[in-house]
Amino acid sequence: MLTKRIIPCLDVDNGRVVKGLNFESIKDAGDPVELAAKYSKDGADELVFLDITASQEKRKTIKELVSNVAKVIDIPFTVGGGVNSMDDARNILLSGADKVGVNTGAVKNPELLTELMTIFGKQCVVVAIDAKRNYSEDSTKTMFEENGKKFWFEVFIYGGKQETGLDAIQWAKKATELGAGEVLLTSIDKDGTKDGYDILLTKKIVDTVSVPVIASGGCGKPEDMSEIFVKSDVDAALAASIFHYENQSVNQVKKILRDKNISVRL
């Protein structure tokens, strides 16, 4: 049985780690280099660094900061934000990242995923998908029903600011066929709520693609992780608030998961 990965996330804005609610109302959470070192030491399996305003502000990810983070950790490290070309990806990897997260750049130019896979290998390419419920009925979309309401999951870009009209399930399938070796799936509806991951969305994506999926958005306690692992068979759980603010170390969370018969690396 493959061990499940626990991945702290650093959402970085202007050189500081921040955390929001539903991608809005941002507050400061600390220094990225300090937090990265702490999480690496505390038993994190990987680290995700998202420059959350890079795409929005049309600027490149802060290479120097990425390089400083890479120096203080000894775990795999994914960096996303403002990746729109081969050069953007190459710069991130040369700065010390192991994998590149692509969201807006892949939606705008899906062939970028194939180019990245061809040059750097599938294992380096992570498609980041930010999805949100859209309550309009559309026969061309993957429809769901919950509490008597019908909806589909829409892909958003530019840090959750712009809708795309893309169905998240269909896009995940296409993106992984084009070359993404992993899906970083964030529920905008659940982001920062601390009331659990989006099980419906996560399970559907896990069942649709043949590459590893990371669940993101909504984790408030270790039990939320055990629930998403059991109910969706997702490969990894990403969290921010629980580690930044809740005084839970990664190892403490892993011990709780192990006690619930979730296979984790301790």
Swiss-Prot record:
What is an annotated GO biological process for this record, any one? Answer: L-histidine biosynthetic process
So which domain of life are we looking at? Archaea
- Name a single GO cellular component: cytoplasm
Keyword list (alphabetical) reads: Amino-acid biosynthesis, Cytoplasm, Histidine biosynthesis, Lyase
Q: Name the Gene Ontology molecular function terms of this record.
A: imidazoleglycerol-phosphate synthase activity; lyase activity
**What is this enzyme's catalytic activity, as reactions?**
5-[(5-phospho-1-deoxy-D-ribulos-1-ylimino)methylamino]-1-(5-phospho-beta-D-ribosyl)imidazole-4-carboxamide + L-glutamine = D-erythro-1-(imidazol-4-yl)glycerol 3-phosphate + 5-amino-1-(5-phospho-beta-D-ribosyl)imidazole-4-carboxamide + L-glutamate + H(+)
* InterPro entries registered for this protein in UniProt: Aldolase_TIM (IPR013785), His_biosynth (IPR006062), HisF (IPR004651), IGPS_HisA/HisF (IPR050064), RibuloseP-bd_barrel (IPR011060)
| Chief location bin | cytoplasm
Active-site residues (renumbered): D11, D130
Q: What is its EC number?
A: 4.3.2.10
Entry-linked Gene3D superfamilies:
Aldolase class I
Q: In which pathway does it act?
A: Amino-acid biosynthesis; L-histidine biosynthesis; L-histidine from 5-phospho-alpha-D-ribose 1-diphosphate: step 5/9
Query: Which compartment or compartments is the protein found in?
Result: Cytoplasm
Q: Which Pfam families match?
A: His_biosynth (PF00977)
Signal peptide per UniProt: none
The record's NCBIfam families line, in alphabetical order, gives:
hisF
Quaternary structure, per UniProt, is: Heterodimer of HisH and HisF.
Functional description taken from the UniProt entry: IGPS catalyzes the conversion of PRFAR and glutamine to IGP, AICAR and glutamate. The HisF subunit catalyzes the cyclization activity that produces IGP and AICAR from PRFAR using the ammonia provided by the HisH subunit.
Q: Which family does it belong to?
A: Belongs to the HisA/HisF family.
What is this protein's name?
A: Imidazole glycerol phosphate synthase subunit HisF
Q: Which gene name does the record give? A: hisF
